Amino acid sequence: MNIAEQVKDALKEEIIAAVVKAGLADESQVPDVLLEVPKDKTHGDYSTNMAMQLARIAKKAPRQIAEDIVKAFDKGKASIEKMDIAGPGFINFYMNNQYLTKLIPAVLEAKEAYGETNTGGGQKVQVEFVSANPTGDLHLGHARGAAVGDSLCNILDKAGFDVSREYYINDAGNQINNLALSVEVRYFEALGLEKEMPEDGYRGEDIKGIGQKLADEFGDRFVHESEEERMKFFREYGLKYELEKLRVDLENFRVPFDVWYSETSLYENGKIEPALETLREKGYVFEEDGATWLRSTDFGDDKDRVLIKKDGSFTYLLPDIAYHKDKLDRGFDQLINIWGADHHGYIPRMKAAIQALGYPAGKLEVEIIQLVHLYKNGEKMKMSKRTGKAVTMRDLIEEVGLDATRYFFAMRSAATHMDFDLDLAISTSNENPVYYAQYAHARICSMLRQGEEKGYEPNLEKADFSHIQSEKEYDLLKIIGGFPEVVAEAAEKRIPHRVTNYIYDLASALHSFYNAEKVIDVENETKTTARLSLMKATQITLANALKLIGVSAPEKM
């Protein structure tokens, strides 16, 4: 348990004790203590509505109850400096700030582990994200999904969940046939031969590259092969090429995966029929008009869904159900899918399938990634000026840098449309949030270097934390102390942007402290050491938070 949790628990215990001591209720009758952090810090560090909760039990006005609680409260036991009553009976608590200095040694000793919580309790969570078709470059929606998905995985891991990151390779559908046909066209063109591009063909530069590579490596060998042999080879070659490109792009984006799961393996390993049989045994499959259907309306879907068409071919839904059954068979406690905005309508049928398999709908969570719009010079940008094509993830990283791309994509709720300001992302000003945060980290590192040059360094044995007493220092410590709670909240609510908000608050408090206080005082070694220790605690916390969203913490800028 971290110090912030210890303080809150002590405060809750003392509130309950005060309620009982004041004769307002028996301990068994006291409701759960709700503590909130007031938005306005002049209203204290914590606030509770316990008086309103007790009104019916104590048969008194909430304000009178609040006064009784305040009189019976032992401030010393809960590190409380003072209390006051606001409005109809809210009780505000102002902490004795000296308790905050206990955070400094705790953070310095925890180092990279600071912020870890046991919120997840080892729960096995699988997060499937990106899962773009291996038929071309990753676009902006994929990039946002990759950044959000990886950040969420990092946060879940920090919060004590057992996380598995998975990429589902769509390699069994018609898109792979189209990929092979498109490669064939470019291969023939590279040899100076004509071939018509199919209507659904892929026209990207990367497909031209595959065709040229094949021509260079094999000459006209495949011109003389049978169509069947040629397509088989081009499917495998094109898929391998595109997958490797995806892997490299994602690794360069600091997005690793534990599992790359092939859709084709569902067929090869006989996973489809058992999934269908399970649904049939549970009574949710029926035949109509020559097709096989899932009775998804039993679970709130707006209509029943076809699983097998009249011609005997599978719809997308059946292998998807088999895939999700396989996930559940692997023993995951929770499945999280991160999908693009175009998949929104697919959620009810997939949730229905999960329930038809015998699991609660909540076993599958789906986070939707909304669209991204780029702006440059105040105008919406649709195409890359360099290529004349749609902007890819690689283009964006080249334009604004890896850190800015990761930070900006993690900065807003994934459920909202995003306007990505390219000019802001590359500006070296405090208006740019990633620059502001990284500059705070570099500024701390500079202070630590200056201290070292003068013979001072963070030292818990030499530091006298009674020197930590300014409002700016306490503001920093309160934010540092809140980091584990932020991690827990971001994990539980699946909101990585909560961490970027926190990073901004911590950076802002650091800059404010830097502009108001002097860290190195050559006439007072214990004070200097205490403040350098505070700076080290801030640096550790900021670096840990940045790491969660895949952003580097530079020591110099």
From Swiss-Prot:
Alphabetical GO biological process terms: arginyl-tRNA aminoacylation
Subcellular location: Cytoplasm
This enzyme's EC code(s): 6.1.1.19
GO cellular component: cytoplasm
Chemical reaction(s) catalysed: tRNA(Arg) + L-arginine + ATP = L-arginyl-tRNA(Arg) + AMP + diphosphate
Short motif 'HIGH' region, span: 132-142
Keyword annotations: Aminoacyl-tRNA synthetase, ATP-binding, Cytoplasm, Ligase, Nucleotide-binding, Protein biosynthesis
PANTHER family, per the entry: ARGININE--TRNA LIGASE, CYTOPLASMIC, ARGINYL-TRNA SYNTHETASE
The protein's name in its UniProt record: Arginine--tRNA ligase
Natural source organism: Bacillus pumilus (strain SAFR-032)
Source lineage: Bacteria, Bacillati, Bacillota, Bacilli, Bacillales
Record gene name: argS
